[in-house]
């Protein structure tokens, strides 16, 4: 029968108690008090029997009390009748008078009865047959009551464990049957518990709304979300899946509420102020200020009625917290300065009044300390830099006033007996100064440009010591909050070890820095060291931390690497994913056109420009570190930082891209006031309000509030405007359509008209007014650019035509206004520049030296006029009557052909024809007149100053005496112009032959950037100064296949001017005078059978350039049709070349002179 431990203990106690009573009875018998003892025994026996007779539940029954299978666990209780106990006790009481043999027999009988009962209990249990036989055998072998009791306890314990095991198996089978039944039942999920939970959540939401824990917007949104969760649960296949899904969704339910924002603010405070979150000791004043700021923000959060207001409160708190964090070093620095000023003032007063016995410095010290402590509390509460500066000035002013009043009161003549020095906290005690030890390691630091510098500062003292970094902060004032970082390795009152890091040193930041340490007694020790920044000799590659200066290498803390390699690899993979996002964001940003700096964009642009270099350095360093697993920076800490930095840089790139897009929208719809209003109120950054120092969650919140939200609003406005435009213009214009061609033609027309207007003004402008053309150019350029912008946005060809005519009208009006201003300021008529006077033709003018003979022209070399034109082969005339000086004349100038002389400037009046001499004497020939400076062609006219500052690019180049100037209408991606003359005579002769004769010179024009040739599209104006140039010049483009294309050109101020949209080989043909009078038929552009194949000598221009110029094939010329040159006027240019009339007169005079010489020789 199964019994509990409690029942066993009761039986054992009863038996022992009976024996004890018997012992008392024996003692009483011998002491004469038997009756009394019997009564005691009887009463106690009855009470004990009654207690023992009371049934108690077994342990198994207690454990399984309410279980349905408790009946299975009930065991037979050991019931000891009262009569049996009396029988067991009474014999013991009488043992004193009975013999030992009888007593022993009774005990054996009782023991045997106990064995039989125990065997019956064993038979009635669920033990196995083997276990039952084992227990029975042990019972039979046991003859001692204690051993039998121990065996009984062992049997009960075994039986109990067996029942427990049986019960567990039953429960396991029961659950298996339930699972099987559930799977076989209908798949419909029982949502009773889920509905109950969701209804509870709805009541919680209603309660939070009543207590203003959430806004009405959040309330409606959350209730709707709960219903959505209910619907999702109803569609689940399994109850477990539904419950998991409900828990997940309910966890997200409160993320956007005021409660979530409240938690975010409190977590930020905990992160900044908790000693567990910070390796450095948190400043107490900073912690208190941050907690006060958080408390105010939480109060404002409770008052918020909309989500926008609540989010704004949270973002404002993060901004203020960041500013508070940034100002803490300045507060400390200001407090240090204040204590330093007090100490210096007191020392100075003490020196001045040390012989004044009446001066009580203790009062002054007390007042000074009171002021310093008062303002120390105020400074710690400062929220911004202006407030901090104001309090600092007030404190110094008050401190100075107190000291001055004390000085005036006690300053007297020196006393004979000096007063004993007052001992005070901040006095300068010379004996104690040596007790402060201040060291800097390394003392002299050398780093390269762009690297970080690290050094360690150690201070030891017998009393409390503070470090003063004010000189360091002044000389390396950080532009961002984390440029200078301080990491205290040891930070006790009398021992401090600080590791200082200064990031990204510039070349001009070599400094000598002084650090100070001061103890409570006012002792100050200074330590000076130098930081030298050198320029990198090799290619500038952003260095990884392993490449830093060797002196600081050993000072870098060896951070333990992560033991969990799988976790570290997951972190690296996550950082690489953020890097890919960053590179993608930068690539998308580069596809957006850059915006020139302007008041609306200046601050934003400066922020982005400042981020470019750190971004590139971070990317390069990260890629290098992940490729070297042996690096000590291959740790979880550094990869977490890279990941965080990449996420911050993504936000910077997105803010820049959104800004550029909005500027494009504003240019597209410049009259839309709503777009401009949103941009200026939200996205426009100022010096006081920008995100330059924000990072992580603060930067993300700033981006969402001030960039993403307003951009989405602007984008919606633009989309609506675009739809409206599409409705007004039903048929979209395809790319490269006639409309696009019309726009391009219109732009070219406006540009050409502007150039034509400028050329006309420049020709008639007086030389002294050349500088004024700059203002005119700027006005015309502005009209052109605005017109081009309007043309791009035009929708119809009629609109384009109107824009072009409007531009012409505006340019004409601008030029008229400009000319009117010139007439008012300049009375002279600025028709033409002043021309040097043509020397009066002598009786027998002598032809200039080295005339250019048409029969054998040399194209490559330009004719030069010597300084003193002397004819080397002119014989001296033996007799020269009536001529004091015998001029040198040519031997016999050829009369059939007029000599080719350089052109002279156009004269206002026709030269006077001298009358034929009446005498046969040789006429007096004057000295050979110096030709005017005009034959030496002037340099290419310089463009007005500032021409390239308003959207144009100007390049110049020279080759010998040839100079070229090229003007682009817009900035060009090139930095140098190259001019080279192709001197292959056969090439020039072939081109001359195919174009109808004349002098031909071939030039190669090209552009380069960074020393490499580049090809730039776009129209450009070429001005080529060749030396002496005739008035009739043809320009040809030599194509890749050898064809010649005639390009419209003109001669202006001695320069050949033409326009083209590319560079290659150009042939310049100058027609001789005979050709100018009687133009050949070949000058008319025509297309005949075969083409001229000209192989170019230069390499890299075309594929055929490697061929020899002698590969010019015979055949007819193919000349593209073009406008005839505009330089066929009779008006002489300013080149010094005389007209045909002058040549004829000079030839006639030469003929007359020759006749006189011939007649003189006959006479002799």
Swiss-Prot record:
It is a peptidoglycan-anchor. The modification Pentaglycyl murein peptidoglycan amidated threonine is found at residue 1135. Residues 434-534 form the Ig-like domain. Residues 59-73 have a biased composition (Polar residues). Residues 167-176, 183-220, 536-564 have a biased composition (Basic and acidic residues). It is found in: Secreted, Cell wall. Its main location: secreted. Keywords: Cell wall, Immunoglobulin domain, Peptidoglycan-anchor, Receptor, Secreted, Signal. InterPro entries: GAG_BD, GAG_BD_sf, Ig-like_dom_sf, Ig-like_fold, Ig_sub, LPXTG_anchor, RICH, RICH_sf. Residues 911-920 have a biased composition (Pro residues). Residues 1136-1164 form a propeptide. Residues 199-438, 439-826 are annotated as: IgA-binding. Residues 1-37 form the signal peptide. A motif (LPXTG sorting signal) lies at residues 1132-1136. This is IgA FC receptor. It comes from Streptococcus agalactiae. The gene is bag.
